[in-house]
């Protein structure tokens, strides 16, 4: 049997649990990429689920995925404008979500009807995890990440 995919790990943490989309994405990425992020870091991401706990903001799973991209592409001492690789990855992830789901807005995403899924968030979070794994593995011309 091959290595488990990121989206499968996200689903294990998200479907049938009390974890929000953000918490599931954080825990799965931390484990999958061997990031060894601290409990303090987990707490920082914990309020990002449910559209920053208000449903009026950006999808929590997307927000955590953006943080993971930054963590894995930024160099020590580098500013945002210097991290072109991360910026390109962020653009690819944003384009994917907007093209696939039409919005980044949590409450609008929760209102989608997805055949075969009781909760549309499960489908959306799974899709974000698949795209994140593709991007970080070097898909679409991005450099191969050295974390796997």
PLM region spans:
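Acidic-glycine-rich active-site phosphate/pyrophosphate-binding loop
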Residues: 1-2, 29-47, 100-106
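Polybasic, low-complexity association/targeting segments
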Residues: 1-17
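An acidic intrinsically disordered interaction segment
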Residues: 17-37, 92-99
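Phosphate-handling active-site elements
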Residues: 32-43, 71-86
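Active-site nucleophile and cofactor-binding loops and adjacent substrate-binding regions
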Residues: 41, 56-61
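Transmembrane alpha-helix interface/packing and boundary motifs in multi-pass membrane proteins
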Residues: 47-56
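DPxDG-like acidic metal-binding loop motif
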Residues: 63-72
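C-terminal binding/interaction regions
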Residues: 85-148
């Amino acid at each position: 049997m091959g290595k488990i995919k990121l989206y499968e790990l996200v689903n294990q943490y998200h479907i049938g649990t009390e974890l929000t989309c953000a918490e599931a994405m954080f825990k799965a990425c931390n484990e999958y990429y061997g990031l060894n992020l601290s409990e303090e870091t987990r707490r920082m991401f914990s309020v990002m689920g449910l559209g920053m706990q208000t449903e009026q903001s950006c999808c929590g799973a997307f927000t955590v995925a953006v943080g993971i991209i930054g963590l894995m592409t930024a160099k020590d001492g580098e500013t945002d404008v210097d991290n072109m690789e991360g910026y390109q990855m962020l653009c690819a992830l944003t384009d994917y979500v907007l093209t696939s789901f039409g919005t980044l807005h949590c409450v609008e995403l929760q209102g989608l009807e997805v055949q075969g899924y009781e909760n549309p968030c499960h489908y959306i979070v799974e899709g974000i995890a698949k795209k994140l794994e593709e991007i970080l593995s070097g898909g679409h011309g991005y450099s191969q990440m050295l974390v796997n």
